[in-house]
Amino acid sequence: LNDIRIPHDWGLEIGILSEMYRNFANNKICQVDIADTYEHKHQEISKNNRQKGLSKMTMDISKALFRKLATQGHVFSNEKFRSLKATYYRLALDMVQIYKTDAEMNGLIFDVHKEEEMVELFAQNIIEAGKIFLESPSENPNIPTWRRVDSADPSILRSFKEAVMEDNS
């Protein structure tokens, strides 16, 4: 785990997953629950501010995916991002219909208009995240690896261990 690069934004999960696939064989990877309960952070949509809420979340996750795919040799362009947007948009609208039907069968209320507005926002965010990705190729949202931290301060891991031992005694 010393070489895992961990994003510090909403790309955390996809970033860690792709790092695990990069560093370990598939048969060495599994998902585990680290808590009995998990509090999901419900976010506002934030249509008018891409730096907040679900809008920021979709931007960060999109950029994380683009960065990881680029490290595997995928080449991106404005045209590629337009194709990704179109593909996402069509599939997402299909899913809205599936969820609407499922909700109706279960007697639940489902606001198609609101869901499709979110699909439109998220589709546009793919384009915006793509622009940022192309304009800022050196953007790095990752915290340093433990190997780098240890190299910068060889005593830090020992200090962490001592602090944990002290807390637990």
Give residue spans per PLM region:
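Catalytic donor-sugar/metal-binding loop of nucleotide-sugar-dependent glycosyltransferases
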Residues: 8, 17-37
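Terminal low-complexity segments of carbohydrate-biosynthetic enzymes
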Residues: 38-39, 43-169
